[in-house]
């Protein structure tokens, strides 16, 4: 990322802070890949692997952002560049619920796991159709926070993914209400219920409810001092998969919080990327 000046329609780059790095490393350019759904445009991107050869096939990773009221863009995303360097296609989309497209687009209250899930599956379908080099039998899914919630949800509703990495996730809005530092405001607002007003509705939106349907090997990554998506949420989903015989592991980071991937200790951020790629390599490569 650099500073630019836009004047009279002319863009001029002012800095070159990353020139040395770019000259010594391969940075894979994301390809803009929007899809249309019932007259609605969803902005997505595809990053081909660093060693892309159109005559070869590669595993692919669906990456899901947090929020949900955040948004991906055509920016340098370190985690995705690491995956591309390891030989993966990486694809990601701003589903309904994302920011930057107005309130109506971002409002998915009481629709978690429904309209967003449809968008992720439709996007994946179209990416696979456009890129026959992606092996449909070697697909992975990962995400953090809301992206972790959706990773938990997805593996309970489809068997198309051969591996998953659920990061700083939550899986149960009933318990999350009482243990998350934002649960008592976020959950009633987004799920339109509390444990006292409509516990059945909250349970319908809980990925852990669908644990008996999961077959996808799943790694859980959590920080011990994460109070947004507390450790108890990760443990619930992990324990549920273990109980139902699904291959799963959990990796915990001491002294880290919800910001591990962004502002955690460098050695921990490096380790997180290692355990993430190691799990995916074991199941997809």
Stretches found by the model and what they are:
Residues 7-9:
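Short loop/turn segments that connect beta-strands within beta-propeller blades
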């Amino acid at each position: 990322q650099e500073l630019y000046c836009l004047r009279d329609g002319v863009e001029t780059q002012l800095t070159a802070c990353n020139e040395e790095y770019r000259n010594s490393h391969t940075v894979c350019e994301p390809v803009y890949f929007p899809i249309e759904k019932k007259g609605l445009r969803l902005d997505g991107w595809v990053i081909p692997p660093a060693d892309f050869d159109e005559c070869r096939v590669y595993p692919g990773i669906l990456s899901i952002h947090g929020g949900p009221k955040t948004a991906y863009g055509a920016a340098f995303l370190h985690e995705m560049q690491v995956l591309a360097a390891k030989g993966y296609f990486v694809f990601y989309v701003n589903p309904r619920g994302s920011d930057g497209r107005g309130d109506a687009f971002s409002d998915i209250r009481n629709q978690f796991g429904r309209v967003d899930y449809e968008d992720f599956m439709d996007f994946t379908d179209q990416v696979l159709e456009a890129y026959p080099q992606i092996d449909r039998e070697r697909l992975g899914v990962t995400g953090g926070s809301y992206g972790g919630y959706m990773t938990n949800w997805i593996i309970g509703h489809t068997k198309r993914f051969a591996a998953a990495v659920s990061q700083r996730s939550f899986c149960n809005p009933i318990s999350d209400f009482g243990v998350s530092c934002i649960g008592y405001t976020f959950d009633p607002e987004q799920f339109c219920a509390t444990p006292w007003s409509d516990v059945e509705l909250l349970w319908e939106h809980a990925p852990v409810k669908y644990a008996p349907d999961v077959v996808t090997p799943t790694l859980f990554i959590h920080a011990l001092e994460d109070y947004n998506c507390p450790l108890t949420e990760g443990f619930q989903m992990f324990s549920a998969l273990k109980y139902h015989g699904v291959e799963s592991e959990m990796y915990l980071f001491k002294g880290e919080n919800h910001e591990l991937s962004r502002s955690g200790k460098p050695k921990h951020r490096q380790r997180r990327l290692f355990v993430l790629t190691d799990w995916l390599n074991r199941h997809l490569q």
